[in-house]
Amino acid sequence: MRLVFFFVFISGLVLGQEKAPFKQFDEVNKEQYALEKKAIDRSKNTALEKTNLRLRLASRYKFQDDLIIALEDKIKQQGESAQLLYLLGGANGIKALQVNKMFSITYVKAMLENFKRALILDPNYLPALEAYVEALCMVPSLLGGDIDRAKQFAAQLMQLDPVQGFFALGYIASIEEQDEQAVGFYAKAFKLLEQQSFCTQDLKNYFAKSSMNLPYKMAEISTALQLSPAIGLCAINHFIDRYTPYDIIPLEWAYFQKAQLLHAIGKINAATDTIKESLEINPAFEAAKKWQRTL
């Protein structure tokens, strides 16, 4: 079963670059969502089948409250797994970003607890390691954040996947405002990708055990730091090719990254066409319009 929800805890800025927002529930679709949900509830499917359908529906419409409930129901029906706990942690993390800070504490604590439980069940589960490192860095210590623990999990990630390990260390360094050190870690990650002949690999298999947002992250860092733009381009092309309504990063942001990477390798006409694609998806995309004016 393909994951219906993909998570990476994203901060507002990394080394000065604006980050893509998560897609959110559109109130315009509220009535249609309610109709589809009612149809599932009235269907003759088994309880588990209904839960899976509710998961897909809530994920597609980005209705976080129902997504959390459906994931909790699935865990009750199937038992805990690292994958389900990771997804539940991610759903709570995004909900925490959507509500008033006063009401976010419950969701933040649930996020950390579920990532922790996921790694107790499977210490080598890469998506949970990636997400937990970033969450521990972003959450205040009073609520359970702990950069020292994040560094320990980053070291564990390094043993399992050195590329992701260097990305994690780079992220931690950027949070600690050690920008030069962060760039050094990211550069090591891209050097490894070059040594792996990344662009010639079967990327579906390459990312099979990683979060679906990892290729976007690779492209984003490549763009921001001007590191290995050809690799960043391969990564973002893979992300776009595999994009579905269940993804949480807006598609226009993927095309925005692609346009900048095309420009970086000297393909100006292709970059111009690609930024137009981004703006066709979202004509109100200010960052893309601002960048387009520089061409």
Over which residues does each language-model region extend?
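N-terminal signal peptide c-region/cleavage motif recognized by signal peptidases
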Residues: S11-L13
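N-terminal leader/linker segments that initiate helical-solenoid repeat arrays
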Residues: L15-I69, K74-K76, Q83-Y86
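Alpha-helical repeat scaffolds
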Residues: Q32-R42, D65-K76, I105-L119, G145-L157, ...
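A structural motif in tetratricopeptide-repeat
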Residues: S43-K44, Q78, D122, Q159-D161, ...
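Residue-level recognition of tetratricopeptide repeat
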Residues: A47-K50, S81, Y125, P162-Q164, ...
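"A position-specific structural signal for the A-helix of alpha-solenoid helical repeats
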Residues: E49-R56, L87, I94, A131, ...
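Alpha-helical adaptor scaffolds
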Residues: E134, M138, K204-W253
